[in-house]
């Protein structure tokens, strides 16, 4: 299962200033970010 809060934190850590948001697609964590 995808944990929304840990997904959000993981995406934020990976993409830092380019991070926009995160969401769960079924059991997968998806990151939304801007490509610099």
From Swiss-Prot:
Location of this chain's protein in the cell: Secreted
Record's note on what induces expression: By bacterial infection.
A single BP term in Gene Ontology: killing of cells of another organism
Disulfide bonds: 2-24, 7-29, 11-31
Record carries keyword 4Fe-4S: no
Organism domain of life: Eukaryota
Keyword Secreted: yes
Tissue expression per record: Expressed in salivary glands and hemocytes.
One Pfam entry name: Toxin_37
Swiss-Prot/TrEMBL keywords: Amidation, Antibiotic, Antimicrobial, Disulfide bond, Fungicide, Secreted
One cellular-component annotation, GO: extracellular region
Residues annotated as signal peptide: none
Modified residues (Glycine amide): 36
Function text: Weak activity against Gram-positive bacteria B.megaterium, S.pyogenes and M.luteus, strong activity against yeasts C.albicans, C.neoformans and S.cerevisiae and filamentous fungi F.oxysporum, F.culmorum, N.crassa and N.hematococca. Less active against filamentous fungus T.viride. Inactive against Gram-positive bacteria A.viridans and S.aureus, filamentous fungi A.fumigatus and B.bassiana and yeast C.glabrata.
Protein name: Termicin
Organism expressing this protein natively: Pseudacanthotermes spiniger
Lineage: Eukaryota, Metazoa, Ecdysozoa, Arthropoda, Hexapoda
């Amino acid at each position: 299962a995808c944990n929304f809060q840990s997904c959000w934190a993981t995406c934020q850590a990976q993409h830092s200033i380019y991070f926009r948001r995160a969401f769960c697609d079924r059991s997968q964590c998806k990151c939304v970010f801007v490509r610099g």
